[in-house]
Swiss-Prot record:
InterPro entries: ConA-like_dom_sf, Sialidase_trypan, TS_C. Gene3D superfamilies: 2.60.120.200. Transmembrane segments: none annotated. This is Sialidase 85-1.3.
């Protein structure tokens, strides 16, 4: 799925993983000094694309994909969630309320999700449709740097919320 990723409570499937437990997740450190992994080319301009299939509706809002930008307090994130009423939800910044809630997902149908960061502009797409975008803050005069990606449970969401999603064909592009 991803170079140097940590997989927790997930089942390997062709070209990816199936997440089925409350704490199932895949954490991919991209620019974390502790891991001695610095992908400088990914700092301010990237596109992450993945195929996802939601097997069944969750009982609440469930994280699908999170990008953590910079190791700052508070942490700045870009999130895609899926809801019990088959909606997509985005949360940009470190907000507790959704930035947008729109579009619908279908159980057992493959969807294409994308997170983009171009300079200080963050965008979220599902199946080619823009779900949300915003300006991300600058640190000094430069944009925040990409820190890590996470699919599923990332330790900051409700650990009792089960995830029933398959993530495959993850691609990361330098823009």
């Amino acid at each position: 799925l991803c170079l140097n990723a940590t997989v927790r409570n997930a089942t390997k499937v062709k070209d990816g993983f199936q997440l089925t437990e409350p704490d199932s997740g895949v954490m991919w450190p991209v620019n974390i000094p502790d891991y001695n992994k610095r992908h400088v080319f990914l700092n301010h301009n990237f596109t992450l694309v993945a195929s996802v299939t939601i097997e069944e509706a969750p009982s609440g809002n469930t994280p699908l994909l999170i990008a953590v930008l910079a190791n700052t307090e508070p942490t700045h994130t870009m999130r895609i969630l899926y809801t019990a009423d088959n909606k997509w939800m985005t949360m940009l910044k470190d907000e507790k309320k959704p930035t947008t809630e729109s579009g619908t997902w279908e159980p057992k149908k493959e969807h294409q999700v994308a997170l983009m960061l171009q300079g200080n502009k963050a965008s979220v797409y599902v199946d080619g449709e823009l779900l949300g975008e915003e300006e991300v803050p600058l640190t000094g005069e430069k944009p925040l740097e990409l820190f890590a990606f996470c699919f599923g449970a990332c330790g900051e969401e409700n650990p009792s919320q089960e995830s029933h999603v398959t993530v495959t064909n993850v691609f990361l592009y330098n823009r």
